[in-house]
């Protein structure tokens, strides 16, 4: 018995944010891809067009020694509950925020680094 696309979509829509994050990570690992680095291939043109990146993803790469302050900060940033924030922090490296502007990404990075977390912006 195979599942239809609609059944898969229904199952995903009933998952928690943490489960979706884990599912995404599992899919990246299984298929050898990264959702953070998906790009489209465009034909080569004679003129090089340089586009400035306007949207950034904030990655929590490590929590450091101060786990509780990091969890509290992640809770305030993401709006997650305590349990979900704790699970998210413990599953580092993980994406905390996606498609945000550069200023917000830098602010989040500084805030998290202040409490001892290691953060990357991509």
Swiss-Prot record:
Keywords on record: Ribonucleoprotein, Ribosomal protein
MF (Gene Ontology): mRNA binding; structural constituent of ribosome
Assigned protein family: Belongs to the bacterial ribosomal protein bL12 family.
GO-annotated biological processes: translation
CC annotations in GO: cytosolic large ribosomal subunit
Organism the protein comes from: Blochmanniella pennsylvanica (strain BPEN)
Pfam family, one: Ribosomal_L12_N
CDD domains: Ribosomal_L7_L12 (cd00387)
Name of protein: Large ribosomal subunit protein bL12
HAMAP family: Ribosomal_bL12
InterPro entries: Ribosomal_bL12, Ribosomal_bL12_C, Ribosomal_bL12_C/ClpS-like, Ribosomal_bL12_oligo, Ribosomal_bL12_oligo_N_sf
Presence of keyword Membrane: no
Domain of life: Bacteria
Role summary: Forms part of the ribosomal stalk which helps the ribosome interact with GTP-bound translation factors. Is thus essential for accurate translation.
